[in-house]
Curated annotation (Swiss-Prot):
Organism ancestry: Eukaryota, Viridiplantae, Streptophyta, Embryophyta, Tracheophyta
Site features described as Reactive bond for trypsin, chain residue numbers: R67, F68
This protein's record includes keyword Transmembrane helix: no
Species of provenance: Solanum tuberosum
Family affiliation: Belongs to the protease inhibitor I3 (leguminous Kunitz-type inhibitor) family.
Record's subcellular location: Vacuole
Cellular component annotations (GO), alphabetically ordered: vacuole
Protein name in UniProt: Aspartic protease inhibitor 9
Purpose: Inhibitor of cathepsin D (aspartic protease) and trypsin (serine protease). May protect the plant by inhibiting proteases of invading organisms.
One GO MF term attached to the UniProt entry: aspartic-type endopeptidase inhibitor activity
SUPFAM superfamilies assigned to the protein according to its UniProt record, in alphabetical order: STI-like
InterPro entries linked to this entry: Kunitz_inhibitor_STI-like_sf, Prot_inh_Kunz-lg
C-alpha cells in the first residue's frame, strides 16, 4: 500500500489550490530570503522576460505570483506538476510564463530555469514539490519518466532546484547541493 499523497500546504496551513496564486518565498532572513520572480535573462533574444530569479533579500519586492498545475486533481507532495507565472500578459508572451529547464549552460555547468515551457506535455517542464524534514519545501525538476523506466525509483532522475549568481542576480538552476528551501504564500 502506498501512503496517501500528502497535500502541499501554504504559509497559512491551507492546501494549495490549482485555481489560486502563490508567491514562492525563500525560507531565511536577509540575503537568504527573497521571493521568486520572472525576469529578463541576460543575453536572451526572447521577446518576453524568460528567466526564473530570486530577489536578493527578504526585504526586496514581492515575487511574481505562480500557479501550480497538477496532472490531475489537487497539489500533492512528490507529484509531477507544471508551474506558471500567473500574470496578465500579451498573447505573444503566454508560453513565456510556463517554467521549464533550459539547455546545459556551459559557464555554470548546469541547467538554468527559464520560461517557455508547456503544460501537460512529456518534456522538461515538470517539477515536484517535496517536503523538508523540519519546515518548508524544495522544488525538484523531474523528467517525465513514466515511459522510460517503469520500475525505477522515480526521484532518481529528478534534480534539486537551487540558485546560481548570474550577472549579480540570483537565478534558479539545477544544483547538487544547497537547494532552495521555500514556502508558498497565497496571493
Amino acid at each position: 500500500e502506498s501512503p496517501l499523497p500528502k497535500p502541499v500546504l501554504d504559509t497559512n496551513g491551507k492546501e494549495l489550490n490549482p485555481n489560486s496564486s502563490y508567491r514562492i518565498i525563500s525560507i531565511g532572513a536577509g540575503a537568504l530570503g527573497g521571493d521568486v520572480y520572472l525576469g529578463k535573462s541576460p543575453n536572451s533574444d526572447a521577446p518576453c522576460p524568460d528567466g526564473v530569479f530570486r530577489y536578493n533579500s527578504d526585504v526586496g519586492p514581492s515575487g511574481t505570483p505562480v500557479r501550480f498545475i497538477p496532472l490531475s486533481g489537487g497539489i500533492f507532495e512528490d507529484q509531477l506538476l507544471n508551474i506558471q507565472f500567473n500574470i496578465p500578459t500579451v498573447k505573444l508572451c503566454v508560453s513565456y510564463t510556463i517554467w521549464k529547464v533550459g539547455n546545459l549552460n556551459a559557464y555554470f555547468r548546469t541547467m538554468l530555469l527559464e520560461t517557455g515551457g508547456t503544460i501537460g506535455q512529456a518534456d522538461n517542464s515538470y517539477f515536484k514539490i517535496v517536503k523538508l524534514s523540519n519546515f518548508g519545501y524544495n522544488l525538484l525538476s523531474c523528467p517525465f519518466t513514466s515511459i522510460i523506466c517503469l520500475r525505477c525509483p522515480e526521484d532518481q532522475f529528478c534534480a534539486k532546484v537551487g540558485v546560481v549568481i548570474q550577472n549579480g542576480k540570483r537565478r534558479l538552476a539545477l544544483v547538487n547541493e544547497n537547494p532552495l528551501d521555500v514556502l508558498f504564500q497565497e496571493v
